[in-house]
Each structure stands twice: as structure tokens, then as C-alpha cells.
């Protein structure tokens, strides 16, 4: 019998499809020392997250967790990986942006989002109404806002000026606009 044909039956053969965890020597020593403490293994934990300073997370995926029976002290075995939630959120936002832009491109390629939505800038410009003087003028506040510059004239503030000074709305509006939206100066001007 030659050495090539020799087959040694070993009881430690691992069946196909089985998962085997190989532990380092220091980890085996730590496990053996912890067995003497009477720790109970906690089943069903799939992820352990430890928060460190500056929102840095230590994440242990598929850990082995043991609990001390006398206190709320847990011992976790597994490979810890550093995870930064800020960078993870940024990557997730980039992925969402890419997915939404891809969906928009696909919708645009299929003819737009809805019926009647312009497919190009030229179509949008052709559909835009022309601005001529026969169009009805916008109501009160919008006209005042465009005439008064970069601030908005609100009817509540005009009514407050009228109540404080006793003048009519036209004078209150004029004072408010001349004071560039400063409510107190408009009231002081009219008194």
C-alpha cells in the first residue's frame, strides 16, 4: 500500500455546508476564562453598536454576546468595524439622488411625466403666455410687493399702522413703503 492510497479516517472532518468559526489563541483563552464566570449566552442578537466620541460608531456584525447573571454587564465577541454615520448618510443621499435622477431620465425618455407636460425648453417657451397690458392686474399685495422693492407689504401690518395712528389705509401704506417696511418708523412718521 502506498502513501497516495492511504486514507485516514478523521473524526474531525467538517461536513459540507457547515460553518466553522476559527478563533485566535488569545480569544480562546479569553473565552475559557469567561466560562468560569458563569456567563449566559444571549441568543438572537445580530448587530451591536457602540457609540464613541464625535458620533463614531463601532459596529459588531453577527456577534456572540454573553451576559453576567448578577448585573447588566455584557461581553461581546466579534469583529468590530468603525462606521461613521455622517459619511454613511452622505453616501445614502448620493445613492438616492442618483436613483431619482435615473428615474427622471427614464420618465423623460418615455415622453415626460404627464400628458401635457412640455418635453423641452422650447415647448415650454412656446406654451408660456405672453405678457401684455390687456392681462388682468394682480391683486393688492402682489402689486404692493413689486412696487415697494424687496419687502412684502402685508395687510396685517397696514391695519396695525391704521389702528395705532388713526390715519386711513392709503396714508398708512404710503408711510410703510416710504420707510422700506419698517413698521415702527412708519408709525412714528404718522404721529
From Swiss-Prot:
UniProt biased composition (Low complexity): 127-139
Location within or outside the cell: Cytoplasm; Nucleus
Residue stretches making up the NAC-A/B domain: 24-89
Gene3D superfamilies, per the entry: DNA helicase RuvA subunit, C-terminal domain (1.10.8.10), Nascent polypeptide-associated complex domain (2.20.70.30)
GO biological process terms, semicolon-separated: cotranslational protein targeting to membrane; protein targeting to membrane; protein transport
PROSITE patterns in alphabetical order: NAC_AB
Keywords: Cytoplasm, Nucleus, Protein transport, Transport
Annotated signal peptide: none
This protein's record includes keyword Protein transport: yes
InterPro entries recorded: EGD2/NACA0like, NAC-like_UBA, NAC_A/B_dom_sf, Nas_poly-pep-assoc_cplx_dom
Top-level taxon in the UniProt lineage: Eukaryota
Family, similarity comment: Belongs to the NAC-alpha family.
PANTHER family: NASCENT POLYPEPTIDE ASSOCIATED COMPLEX ALPHA SUBUNIT-RELATED (PTHR21713)
Quaternary organization: Part of the nascent polypeptide-associated complex (NAC), consisting of EGD2 and EGD1. NAC associates with ribosomes via EGD1.
Protein name in the entry: Nascent polypeptide-associated complex subunit alpha
Organism for this UniProt entry: Cryptococcus neoformans var. neoformans serotype D (strain JEC21 / ATCC MYA-565) (Filobasidiella neoformans)
Amino acid at each position: 500500500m502506498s502513501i497516495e492510497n492511504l486514507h485516514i479516517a478523521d473524526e474531525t472532518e467538517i461536513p459540507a455546508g457547515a460553518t466553522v468559526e476559527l478563533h485566535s489563541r488569545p480569544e480562546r483563552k479569553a473565552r475559557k476564562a469567561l466560562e468560569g464566570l458563569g456567563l449566559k449566552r444571549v441568543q438572537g442578537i445580530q448587530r451591536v453598536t457602540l457609540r464613541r466620541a464625535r458620533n463614531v460608531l463601532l459596529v459588531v456584525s453577527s456577534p456572540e454576546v454573553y451576559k453576567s447573571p448578577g448585573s447588566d454587564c455584557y461581553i461581546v465577541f466579534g469583529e468590530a468595524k468603525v462606521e461613521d454615520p455622517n459619511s454613511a448618510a452622505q453616501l445614502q443621499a448620493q445613492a438616492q439622488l442618483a436613483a431619482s435622477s435615473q428615474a427622471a431620465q427614464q420618465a423623460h425618455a418615455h415622453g415626460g411625466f404627464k400628458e401635457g407636460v412640455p418635453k423641452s425648453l422650447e415647448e415650454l417657451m412656446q406654451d408660456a403666455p405672453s405678457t401684455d397690458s390687456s392681462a388682468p392686474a394682480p391683486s393688492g399685495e402682489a402689486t404692493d410687493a413689486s412696487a415697494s422693492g424687496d419687502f412684502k407689504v402685508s395687510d396685517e401690518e397696514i391695519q396695525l399702522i391704521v389702528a395705532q395712528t388713526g390715519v386711513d389705509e392709503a396714508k398708512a401704506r404710503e408711510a410703510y413703503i416710504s420707510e422700506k417696511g419698517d413698521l415702527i418708523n412708519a408709525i412714528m412718521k404718522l404721529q
